[in-house]
A protein has these predicted regions:
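Non-catalytic cap/lid and distal C-terminal segments of serine-dependent acyl enzymes
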Residues: 5-273
Length: 273
């Protein structure tokens, strides 16, 4: 696990400024281009699933590290995307290649799985409930593929980082760990309001120092019930040029949290309805 770097913070940004940063920052220019490892992707699939929680058909992405066949029996890292990306974009982001690279560097193998969330958040919105999709349906879809849905972690960036933290707060014990890149949080929001419910859940927290959300993320860091188990802060903006430099550390952290088959508190079909 990469040693975390914890730096000093300034004051928190206002909620309005935060919203503009995370809605548009993923495609904002500046900074280096994303760096993707040379390792080959294993089996990557984008399929369609009918989501009762969302009331629509969604894209369902899965990735297995190269050399691990169909991934049967492997634990799962759930992916919560940000506002400008969707599951069909994940192969082009190199997520399957990052996964193989992590395993080739010695990380215990796991699979990635994600589905289409709402463009602006991962919270219930009337009859459209992407959070319930992640909690109730996504593990069942993974279980049907033969993955070990009793061992789950979650990783998200920007809006998806917010959603990953909120998921862990709403359903304590559902995931073994949370990895959040530049989560779109602000003091006083639902994540800050439920932060004590993260007690006992290892958190990895990363953010670029040039990100408009940096002060908010540092405020969240201070509010957490325990120090982050992984993460850090260095030069970088709210885009994949920065995030791509932290995926390796996040996957190493996630793999370590998922590695023990006997420590999970959730059965393979728990939460599925």
């Amino acid at each position: 696990m990469r040693r975390r770097t914890l730096l000093a913070s300034g004051s928190a940004l206002g909620a309005a400024a935060m919203a503009g940063a995370w809605m548009f920052g993923e495609t904002r220019g500046g900074g280096p281009a994303p760096v993707v490892p040379a390792a080959p992707a294993g089996a990557e699939r984008v399929e369609q699933r009918a989501s009762a929680a969302r009331g629509r058909v969604v894209d369902f992405y899965t990735a297995v590290p190269d050399g691990h066949g169909d991934g049967r029996g492997l634990p799962v890292c759930l992916i919560l995307h940000g506002g400008s990306k969707r599951p069909p974009d994940f192969p082009a982001l190199g997520l399957g290649r990052f996964l193989t690279d992590a395993v080739r560097r010695g990380a215990p193998p796991f699979v990635l799985a994600g589905a289409t969330g709402d463009r602006l958040n991962w919270r219930p919105n009337g009859a459209d409930d992407p959070q319930r999709m992640v909690h109730d349906e996504l593990p069942a879809w993974c279980d049907a593929r033969g993955f070990d849905a009793g061992r789950l972690a979650v990783w998200g960036w920007s809006m998806g980082g917010y959603g990953a933290l909120l998921l862990a707060e709403t359903f304590p014990g559902f995931v073994r760990s949370v990895a959040a890149f530049s989560p779109a949080v602000a003091p006083g929001d639902a994540v800050f309001g439920g932060v004590q419910r993260l007690t006992g859940t290892p958190i990895g927290l990363w953010c670029g120092r040039d990100d408009g959300l940096y002060d908010n993320v540092k405020a969240l860091h201070r509010a957490l019930p325990a120090e982050p188990a992984a993460g850090g802060y260095r030069a970088g903006r709210h885009n994949f040029g920065y995030w791509s430099t932290e995926v390796a550390a996040a996957f190493d952290f996630t793999a370590a949290m998922l590695a023990d088959p006997g420590s999970g508190s959730r059965g393979p079909a728990a939460g599925a309805q």
